[in-house]
């Protein structure tokens, strides 16, 4: 992808920076501040070119705008991407500390128009480090006055989304269904446990062989990484990186439901159309995985109790039922229906704010 096409984006702001000493590129993209300051996690990963990092940040920021709106949260959408010069695990502590300090400086210069939190390859400890330089950070450790990890709340929301999608697809409950979980990290691992407790038969895959071995020891079945997208299952739960369902994959995916925690699971609109035409019911990711945003914004901005946050995460299932109702009534894909619902809620929130 060219840098020109990556910059052809309709969001509000793009901030980039390069650090010669570490070789890291920094990207912050603010998609919308209509409902409040933009918010979105910090993702650290390797990219083949800067254009890919810009595109990833833009897509993720857009998803955050939708996620905040559909969840009735008073924030906009943004995202940070740190394009690393080497795999995260190979970066020494002093280099990582410098990378985080520079990222915090970039955030602080935005003067509260953007807040960040943990994402791929960043955690609460990293948020504590960012907080040494800037106040505009979610997901700090409990010891630093933050809400801690949002992983379990995210998993709860995805689990409720999965149950709602399975029920709407006419499959009843998860009991006895085969669920393939791709990615056994903090969210995917918790989701797998919840699905197993509900009686699902689990197939699991992860790049981390220790995670897979642990799952197998619990009685689950491992699937080779190269076989994930061709293995038959009732429910496919992508919980790793996004973009896994391309048009080619959508034509051959052998499942009835797609409901996972990964962001931007569907690579493009055509893939969504193909899934819909084939009768594969997809839980739009920005609805299904909103539990993390609910946890961080609810606890650290709105002052919600743990019980209220949990209730709001469980209510993701109800939100999906509204999405499916719009999809059925209007004859559109669930993704289009979810965007319609997000737009409706954003307009309602804007009207309420304007008349308050």
UniProtKB/Swiss-Prot annotation:
Protein's name according to its UniProt entry: Phenylalanine dehydrogenase
Gene3D superfamilies named among the record's database cross-references: Leucine Dehydrogenase, chain A, domain 1 (3.40.50.10860), NAD(P)-binding Rossmann-like Domain (3.40.50.720)
Free-text function comment from the UniProt entry: Catalyzes the reversible NAD(+)-dependent oxidative deamination of L-phenylalanine to phenylpyruvate.
EC number: 1.4.1.20
Record entry for activity regulation: Subject to competitive inhibition by 3-phenylpropionate for the conversion of L-phenylalanine to phenylpyruvate. Subject to competitive inhibition by D-phenylalanine for the conversion of phenylpyruvate to L-phenylalanine.
Assigned protein family: Belongs to the Glu/Leu/Phe/Val dehydrogenases family.
Positions contributing to L-phenylalanine binding: 67, 118-119, 263
Disulfide bond entries: none
Annotated residues for binding of NAD(+): 43, 119, 150, 154, 183-189, 206-207, 211, 240-241, 261-263
Encoding gene per record: pdh
SMART domains: ELFV_dehydrog
Enzyme class, broadest EC rank: oxidoreductase
Assembly and oligomerization: Homotetramer, dimer of dimers.
Alphabetical keyword list: NAD, Nucleotide-binding, Oxidoreductase
Reaction equations catalysed: L-phenylalanine + NAD(+) + H2O = 3-phenylpyruvate + NH4(+) + NADH + H(+)
Pathway in which this enzyme or protein is active: Amino-acid biosynthesis; L-phenylalanine biosynthesis; L-phenylalanine from phenylpyruvate (PDH route): step 1/1
CDD domains listed in its UniProt record: NAD_bind_Leu_Phe_Val_DH
Gene Ontology molecular-function annotations: nucleotide binding; phenylalanine dehydrogenase activity
GO biological process, one term: L-phenylalanine catabolic process
Active site residues according to the UniProt entry: 79
